[in-house]
Amino acid sequence: MTYEAEMEQIVSTALTLQDDYIKFTPRNQNMACHAEIIGIFHDIHPTVEIKEPHQDKSVLQETLVELYSVLGIPQEPQVSKTMKFEEPEQHKESSSTVTRSDSLVNSLQSTGLKRPFCEDEHREYKKPLIQAEDISPATSTRSRKRTIYSKEQTNFLQNQFDLNPYPDFVNRCRIAKITGIPEPRIQVWFQNRRARHLPRATTFHSPQGRKSPTSEGPRSFLSREAHYPDEWGQAPNPSNTQPYPN
């Protein structure tokens, strides 16, 4: 017998067996169990019509319940088999935080109240405000700063004040060049000196009825200024002495 003939015989035998046993071959384990139960039920109650299993799960479940009740088999309450996936703890915490924040926002929107401060925000809120003295220390120190004059500078300024308590800009610049003091400082010094001494000096009269030297006016001081010896070693030349213009 050739190889092809053997293959044809095997195939025909397999087809014959499949045609003979197709009705008795269960599709799966559940179908085999169901067929066994139906066979037992048919032996006990041959008059009951057995329906073919329906594809619908609900109909199949009702059929099984009816079958169990007839057989007297106690049934346990069926629990719905739902897959419960356990979420990671981190995901649970984040979801709970989001839920709390959403509920807080909704409650605040409904009530119209201000939200409470968090711990970090509360700590920042408790910090003291910057004082005004810390913001501008330069201005306060600048306003309190005083110019310290040397003894020679003070004597020279006092002598110039005795000669003319109202020096103009040209005279102040000359005094600044001699003493090395800025002209604005010299102007302030003369203003302070006039505020302290001039009111008393103008109202003062000697017992003989003569006025004080300061009441003679600025013109007399200009004529006397040329004959005053220079404190800084630069005596003016008498031949070139002229009164300074006002």
From Swiss-Prot:
InterPro entries: HD (IPR001356), Homeobox_regulator (IPR051306), Homeodomain-like_sf (IPR009057). One of its GO terms (cellular component) is nucleus. Transmembrane segments: none annotated. Induction: By wnt-signaling and by the dorsalizing factor LiCl. Activated in the dorsal side of the embryo by a ctnnb1-tcf7l1 (beta catenin-tcf3) complex. Repressed on the ventral side by tcf7l1/tcf3 alone. Autoregulated by siamois itself. Residues 142-201 bind DNA. Gene3D superfamilies: Homeodomain-like. Keywords: Activator, Developmental protein, Differentiation, DNA-binding, Gastrulation, Homeobox, Neurogenesis, Nucleus, Transcription, Transcription regulation, Wnt signaling pathway. Residues 84-94 have a biased composition (Basic and acidic residues). Residues 84-107, 199-246 are annotated as: Disordered. The record marks Q191 as: Determines DNA-binding specificity. Its main location: nucleus. It comes from the Eukaryota. Signal peptide: none annotated. Most abundant in dorsal-vegetal cells of late blastulae/early gastrulae embryos. Residues 95-107, 203-217, 236-246 have a biased composition (Polar residues). GO terms for molecular function: DNA-binding transcription factor activity, RNA polymerase II-specific; RNA polymerase II transcription regulatory region sequence-specific DNA binding; sequence-specific DNA binding. Pfam families: Homeodomain (PF00046). One of its GO terms (biological process) is positive regulation of transcription by RNA polymerase II. It is found in: Nucleus. PANTHER family: HOMEOBOX PROTEIN SIAMOIS (PTHR46123:SF8), MIX-TYPE HOMEOBOX GENE 1-RELATED (PTHR46123). Essential for Wnt/beta-catenin-mediated formation of the Spemann organizer and for induction of the organizer precursor, the Nieuwkoop center. Acts as a transcriptional activator, cooperating with TGFbeta signals to induce a program of organizer-specific gene expression and to generate an organizer with both head- and trunk-inducing activity. Activates the head organizer gene cer1 by acting synergistically with otx2 and mix-A/mix.1 through the 5'-TAATCT-3' element of the cer1 promoter. Also binds as a complex with lhx1/lim1 and mix-A/mix.1 to the 3x 5'-TAAT-3' element of the cer1 promoter. Named 'siamois' (French for siamese) because ectopic expression leads to the formation of embryos with duplicated axial and head structures, which resemble siamese twins. This is Homeobox protein siamois. It comes from Xenopus laevis (African clawed frog). The gene is siamois.
